Amino acid sequence: MDWRVVVVLAPVIIAGSWAIFNIAAAALNQLRNMQTKK
């Protein structure tokens, strides 16, 4: 595997995983809020 591929893909993978992490945290908070309001 060429090192240039790693250099190009690493920031994309990091950004994608960070976005998924933030979206999952927000979704869990919203689910908790919905459960407590019932």
From Swiss-Prot:
Name the UniProt record assigns to this protein: Photosystem II reaction center protein Y
Task performed by this protein: Loosely associated component of the core of photosystem II (PSII), it is not always seen in crystals. PSII is a light-driven water plastoquinone oxidoreductase, using light energy to abstract electrons from H(2)O, generating a proton gradient subsequently used for ATP formation.
Species of the source: Picosynechococcus sp. (strain ATCC 27264 / PCC 7002 / PR-6)
Transmembrane segments: 5-23
Subunit structure comment from the entry: PSII is composed of 1 copy each of membrane proteins PsbA, PsbB, PsbC, PsbD, PsbE, PsbF, PsbH, PsbI, PsbJ, PsbK, PsbL, PsbM, PsbT, PsbX, PsbY, PsbZ, Psb30/Ycf12, peripheral proteins PsbO, CyanoQ (PsbQ), PsbU, PsbV and a large number of cofactors. It forms dimeric complexes.
GO molecular function: manganese ion binding
Entry GO terms, CC: photosystem II; plasma membrane-derived thylakoid membrane
Chief place of localization: membrane
InterPro entries the UniProt entry points to: PSII_PsbY
Entry's localization field: Cellular thylakoid membrane
Entry keywords, A to Z: Membrane, Photosynthesis, Photosystem II, Thylakoid, Transmembrane, Transmembrane helix
Family, per entry: Belongs to the PsbY family.
GO terms (BP aspect): photosynthesis
Lipid bilayer topology: Single-pass membrane protein
